[in-house]
A protein has these predicted regions:
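Conserved beta-strand hairpin/beta-sheet module of binuclear metal-dependent hydrolase folds
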Residues: 3-65, 153-156, 160-164, 246, ...
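Metallo-beta-lactamase
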Residues: 4-8, 102-224
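Active-site neighborhood of phospho(di)ester-bond hydrolases with catalytic His/Asp-centered motifs
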Residues: 48-50, 72-80, 100-103, 162-165, ...
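Short N-terminal or domain-adjacent regulatory/targeting segments
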Residues: 215-242
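Conserved small/polar residues in nucleotide/adenosyl-binding loops
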Residues: 278-279
Length: 280
């Protein structure tokens, strides 16, 4: 298991996938991707999401190491997409006493993916509901279409952790040495980009929470300078530019259009355009 610390009571049990060629069968991920999952160890134990079926065995080994002989009381399902929920049935059958936590839409979707019996095991939550684990309490915030209709996030009130589902995610395995913003930007616009209104709704809800740690389902755990990450999400979801300027995009077979584009850039700069950039 990766030695990644969230807090003393919250353990990272996710896995990296360097074997994947295309994320969701369409997005190139040269540095792989991480499937993040977490476990909260308190009087009650809660597993926060599962992982893709490609990595079930490795993930279960991580979970068992973190549990150190304990059992699971709650399985929290924030997102039903298979890269986060594919191992749900395996986990539910391994710990048959564990209750499954989700919203009404979650439980409408589970039978479409799995065959295990949910009778007597459902904890249905809605906006603002809480779940006490002992000294830790989860507060649930609905985040529909960020980026599936059943998505919800959870805020742990004692350690001020936001389990943000696909929000604040990033392409790239956790051992990738790369800038956060570049691959987070590409992830955002491919996965959540058309749901700007819904992301704005979530950001407004998050503004009322005292967040010190963000635990996404892809990419690194965020502990410092959270205003930077939240600010980028605010900009992206408003479809505003990160930097003021003018993009001149062109294709030029014989070089004439290129010359015209460069001349246009010179004119714009002379008129005080803050920045111009050529793209061929």
């Amino acid at each position: 298991m990766k030695d990644i610390k969230v807090t003393d009571s919250v353990k990272y049990i996710g896995v990296d996938d360097h074997d994947i060629d295309l994320f969701e069968s369409q997005y190139v991920v040269p540095n792989g991707v991480s499937y993040n999952s977490y476990v909260i160890l308190d009087e009650k134990v809660a597993v926060m999401d599962t992982v893709d079926a490609r990595k079930t065995d490795e993930w279960l080994a991580n979970l068992e190491e973190a549990l150190d002989g304990r059992s699971v009381d709650y399985i929290v399902v924030s997102h039903m997409e298979p890269d986060h929920a594919a191992s749900l049935q395996v986990l539910a059958e391994k710990y048959p006493e564990a209750q499954v936590v989700g919203n009404a839409k979650t439980f409408n979707m589970i039978p479409q993916f799995f065959t295990f019996d949910l009778e007597g095991r459902k904890v249905v939550v809605k906006e603002g509901d809480t779940l006490s684990l002992g000294s830790h309490t989860l507060q649930f915030v609905m985040a529909p279409m960020v980026h599936w209709p059943e998505v919800m996030v959870a805020y742990e009130t004692s350690e001020k952790i936001l389990f943000s589902a696909d929000g604040f995610g990033k392409f790239g395995a956790l051992d990738a040495d790369e800038d956060w913003a570049c691959e987070a930007r590409r992830y955002y616009f491919n996965i959540c980009g058309k749901y700007g209104v819904q992301v704005q709704n979530l950001l407004k809800k998050a503004a009322g929470l005292d967040i010190e740690i963000i635990c996404p389902l892809h990419g690194p755990i965020l502990k410092e300078n959270l205003g930077y990450y939240i600010g980028l999400y605010d900009t992206w979801s408003k479809y505003e530019p990160e930097n003021e300027g003018i993009l001149i995009a062109y294709a030029s077979i014989h070089g004439n259009t290129a010359a015209a584009a460069k001349k246009l850039a010179e004119i714009l700069e002379a008129k005080g355009a803050p920045r111009s950039e050529e793209r061929r």
